[in-house]
Amino acid sequence: MLLLIFLNFFILRGDTLLTKEKTISDFQNALSVTTDGKENIYVLDAGTNQIVKFNNKLEYKKRNGKQGWGEGQFDYPTFIDGSSGLDIFVSDGKNHRIQRLDLELNYISSLKTDLPDFNVELKFRTPAASLILNSSELYVIDADNNRIVVYKDGRNPSGVFGDYKSGKGQLIHPVKILKDSRNFIYVLDKEQKAIVRFDNLGNYLNKLEISDLENFAIRGNTLYLFNGKEITRYDLERSSVIDKLSLPESSRKKKYTDILVLTDEKYLLLKKNELSLWVKK
């Protein structure tokens, strides 16, 4: 798979240059960005322990959150997940929980499994990221054990994968988890510099190893690989590169913390202090 990607790179002719269309500089340490079923945008700012909400035109709507351990409060959260389309999940690792909010950023519930009566084989202490499948199945990256724990109804555990028992699918340092339109699961492993793919039962499928990979996104059945300089679009059904979208020289190799694909023409890139909209023209 690795060889296939690089062979396709060599035969591509000409990159498309992305153009920056809008910038929002209103963050202290923004780490994660997501969207919901209504195309609203949510930025997780770990520096202020807040979520900032924008509409699909990147117009400010509201913000919520502060440092603490109460309901709707955070302590350096690491990941925001709108994959259900209906609500928002925040990985609040230092508080050892996943918090669920509605689309107006009102608190709904928390999942905290680091408890004495919880099965040690099926609990997490520090959640790094999360994903929702089939409306209610919650998949959590357990950062302390480098694995994925599954909660079929969002609360009761049903299994794990990606641990030492997973063979080629063993994870070493998982940091991000996404899904495609077929509900296949993709995990970014920083230590392996790879995206590890599983089916929705947690069975290992394959691995994409990319030496300069920094982040990734998925829209439909297209994988977007980002190395800080360019976005490579990869067709998951054909296992081939579609094209490359390049940033201007002045914007390359900045410290980007996340990427979100709005359409094939519009991309959001997140930095510590800035959210920027990039357009393919």
What are these regions (language model features)?
Residues T19-T23, K62-G72, S110-L122, G159-G169, ...:
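Surface-exposed loop and turn segments in beta-propeller and other repeat-based domains
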Residues K22-N49:
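Beta-strand-rich domains and repeat architectures in extracellular enzymes and scaffolds
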Residues A46, G93, A143-D144, K190, ...:
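Short loop/turn segments immediately following the C-termini of beta-strands
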